[in-house]
Amino acid sequence: MNELSVNDAFDDIEIESFDFIWEEWEEYKGDVPLWQHIFCGSIAGLMEHVFMYPLDTLKTYFQTNGHMKYNMIYDNCNTINNNNNNIYRGNNSSYKNTCDKNYKDMNNHRNMQTFKRNFCSSTNCDKCIINNFCKYKTNCYNVMAALHTKNNRYIHNIAEPLKNMANYKINTTNNNNVNNIINNNNNNNKKKSRNIFSYPSHTKQYRNVTYVVNKKMQQNLFNNYISNKCINDPFCCRTKTNVLNMKKDIHKFCHLSKEKYNNVFYQNDTYHPNIYGRKRKTLCRNKNNINLFKNHVHKKYCHSLDDQICHSKIKEDMRNLQNFKNYTCAKNMKRHLYSTVPFFNLKNKGNKNITLPYKEIRSKYILKNGYKSMYQRNAGYYKNLIKMQSAKKNRHQLLALRKCLMSEKKYTIIKNEPFIIRKKKNMRNEYFIGNMKGRCIINTSLNSYTLKRNCLDYHHFVNNLKNICYSIMNICYNIKNTILINPSLPINNNNNNNNNTKMDTFIKLINKCLYNNNAHKIDHKILLSNYLNLFKHTNYSYYYILNNFLKNNAPCTSRKNEWNIFSNFINVLKNKIITNNVDYIRNPNVRRNQILRNNYLYSFLRNYNKNLKRNTHMILNKLTSFKYSIPYIKNKYSNVLINNINTNNNTYSNRNVLNSIRYNNIYKNIMHPIFFPGYYNTIHFRYYNYFSRIIDDKDKGKNKNIINISTKRNNCSSIIRNNLSNLYKGVNVVVLGCIPAHALYFSTFEYSKKYFSRMTSNNSSLKMNNRNISTVSNDIKSEKSNFKLYDLNYFSIAVSGFLATLVHDLIITPIDTLKQRIQLGINKNSKDSLKLLKQNGIRSLYLSLPITLLMNIPYQIIMICTNEKMKKIYFEYICGLNTQNNKKNMENKVIDKVHDETRNQDNIGKDIKNDTYNMDKNGTFLRNQEMINKENRIYNSGALEKHVTSQEKEDKILQSVKQENVSSNNDIVNFYEGQSIYNNDAHNIIRDDINKMTHKNLENNIDNTINSNESDVNRIDNMTNDMNKECDIFSINKNNNSTVLYDQIMKRLEMNSSNKNFSLNFHDKIIRQESSPFEKENYNMNLKNIWIDNYKNDFFNKPFNHITSYFVCAGIGGGIAAVLTNPLDVIKTRIQTECFQTKGFNFFRIVSNIYYREGMRSFFKGSLARMALCIPASAVSWGTYETMKRFFKINFNTT
């Protein structure tokens, strides 16, 4: 089909009780005005966005990982704001006002889980919500964020946080234990005040320090702060050159011998000797070039790249070097850096001064444009080399992380390797949880697990960190097999002096289970507290611990399943064992080593107060280093580390991140335990505190339900449950944008399809397939026709959809960006969103336009093509247009009847039909003498005596018939010539056919006129039979297009020549009289509607069901298009929510980040939600538009 739609094909269908006319593409001619398209499109867009807005909100949540992570920042800010002794409130009033205001603003969105790690994660900009509250903690967070990015191009963001941190003063105390910290809370004499950058007393650090350098070598605020502090010192800064060098790159000026291994150019092909020894690996292809460059850069006591290249003032710097080495420059730099970075240090047990380790990263040198003249050939090469060095440092950390997690050195992680833990199908030692009768409780959280491999080696238990996890899981497994809970047993607790009653009860419970309430002990009992030394940082590098303790290759596993087993067991202990006294029933089949493993748990629990609980308080103190760490201890359940446990680690557990250096960009989620610098401590520390929270009895009634391990689904359900209005946030912005967008969308679509329809060569909607030709007589053949819709022209549909989508997205893209940011809580309301235009400009609202077009263009094309195809199928097969096979027997009967009646025709009628008439060029008929003689014979015959009239009356009748036929003939020919349906070659054929048809029709009209007073029905049958014969003979030599044209012309002539008071039965079709389309010289011809009664479906004949087809077909098209374009929609949503304040984005980098961070499945996040959104949205939009347009056409546009 060369048309763009199938709507024109349905003009040949008439529905009873409802004038349901499908509009033809080529028949607009002002039929539907422009304002009606705009009005209908506006109503359709409003209906779509308002009713579907809740589903769109949920889709946005699913595609952005479902929720805003890290709610502990809220708890942190809440704790600080509720603390009356807050150090910032007393010393800085501006902080008080800012923090209070920002906290209230963010707390309004708390129900929506509005906080995300960083909404501008692509650039780590400082205008995100994360930088607007909890000043010091936020600045520490930003420092950590800058130190954990893939490249050092984000490191310039460290300057502003350090500047903010330098404005505050903190109170510190030198305590030896936790009790001193609590006792000193009321002792103001022991408080010591110092600046945040001042140097606290600390133990000697053996790790070398490398400092952060700005990417473009701009003057770093942090370096300025240090240089200004030392500017008056005669030993440090004797000349202005030293000050300038310090401002440029202070750590290069302090180029000590111990730090040479941290220099990028020096360590181009070697590992750090303190970590990996002297093992060398080549990273550069051309080693001679890099060595040549080192000779230029690394001369003896050369301190800055600028001085080295310029070869100036080297002697002056050398004279000042020794004095500068012996003074405080390098030491102060070390102290400042590690005193500002929060880091876990489990080694400190309270007997030494508080120390905070630091993050070690490599410096980055950038060659300026002015240096390219000397090193024009190699400047770009060395730039890339610097990036490789930075990536290599990250790779070293990944290698250490891999050893810590997987206990292997050379083998990569196999993605689909079977888990070590598997469910035991047939378990002999069954366990029961229930009442005294032993009735088994279904749906319990206890599950039977066993180890697939025997990974326990008690002699080398300390040498393998993984065995700690395995032993804990075996403990869980064996206790589940040996404990039978009996709630009927009484609780025996005689120790009333101990405050920690629940802990004592639990220990006694385990003692009863392990030793049957006896006092004997096992000699070879291993204390789990000794293994905690593996989690501590030592004075030397932690790589040393990993290389010495992680030598055994343990099989790979999934940490997610391991910890799920452990957490399930802990929940059982909380819900069953602690709340009910337990009687020990020892199974004689239990092996001896199982008792030993149970003893591990007992040892661990017995040393609970002495080890884990104390470390909890100390780590909190070391994390903050300030006085307000005490409220964390008092209000422990508001603590970040205890109240928020991240168990959603499945994005990393089965992925090999060490195959390529470019995998370093997955470390955007810096608070994730895998990516956090203290991961070696925090991953175990978190779960141990998880264990302690369940066992500890403090605030039992208030905090028994505080364990909130939130997931994406729980978050969305909590949003709906807490406040349904959250699903409609931002709907006012969408209403203002969807009305003009959809009005232009539908108007552009309608007029573009009208334009392309005129360019097609064939505008006919229906074609008649020539099938089943049967013989009526020896000379006449009758053709049975099969109606069928032409095929769709998908190219024209695609072009129309493309133009409409382009206009639509230019308007809706900025609205969609603002809408999604309001949905996620990034902006509070529409006014707050509009304020961003002043800061970022309107260009920031169109960042996602390319990806939006890339998504919407294929979506709209697929949806429109599917919609048109479904409507074609609906009206072809359901409505019976293509069911001619069912009519076969009826047509044969009609043809036989016509054949019999033909033989019985009157001879006079045959003579009249054989007469010929001449037609001139203008279409007028000429009478010859032979015709006049025949008329005289007919007039004088006895058979026509009753119908004889005067010659004048006959002349008047003939003249009227000739005028009517001539005018009708000219109108038809002029109409089809004006429409340019056929080529010029076809015009002559059509005119000849019309002349023949008009000649035969004139003869029949003469018969009807002469015999008007005769009430003989056979005359009418004869006339009909003659017309049928001519139609059959005519259709044999015609193609499908001319057949349709001939059929329409015949119907028109039948109406003009027949009486208006009766209908003519023609081939079993009911031809209904319509108003004349030729009035007032209007050539917009409305062809008559045909409905086949034998194939009419009563159900689909109802107007409501036909209107429903609009919605059903559009909904099917929207669902198919939604699934196919969902990956592009995910990318669009990420760009709109995460790259708002950037000047641009790299499409392939964003796609690679999503893939390597979350896997291929992340591209299909929210597919079901998007289908649930797009199916009703498309149905409502297109169904409403088509229904409204049809309403206007029937009621306002008909004449």
From Swiss-Prot:
SUPFAM superfamilies hit by this protein: Mitochondrial carrier (SSF103506)
Main subcellular localisation: mitochondrion
One GO MF term attached to the UniProt entry: ferrous iron transmembrane transporter activity
Residue windows of the Solcar repeats: 792-873, 1109-1191
Membrane-spanning ranges: 32-52, 730-750, 795-815, 845-865, 1111-1131
Domain of life: Eukaryota
Glycosylation (residues): 92, 171, 208, 268, 326, 353, 443, 499, 539, 649, 708, 715, 723, 763, 772, 914, 922, 965, 1013, 1022, 1041, 1056
Subcellular location: Mitochondrion membrane
Induction: Expression is modulated by the levels of iron ions in the environment.
Family: Belongs to the mitochondrial carrier (TC 2.A.29) family.
Membrane protein topology class: Multi-pass membrane protein
Assigned keywords, A-Z: Glycoprotein, Ion transport, Iron, Iron transport, Membrane, Mitochondrion, Repeat, Transmembrane, Transmembrane helix, Transport
Role summary: Putative iron transporter.
A biological process term (GO) from this entry: iron import into the mitochondrion
Gene3D superfamilies, alphabetized: Mitochondrial carrier domain
InterPro entries for this protein: Mitochondrial_sb/sol_carrier, Mt_carrier_dom_sf
KO phenotype (gene knockout): Attemps to generate a knockout failed.
Entry protein name: Putative mitoferrin
GO cellular component terms, A-Z: mitochondrial inner membrane; mitochondrial membrane
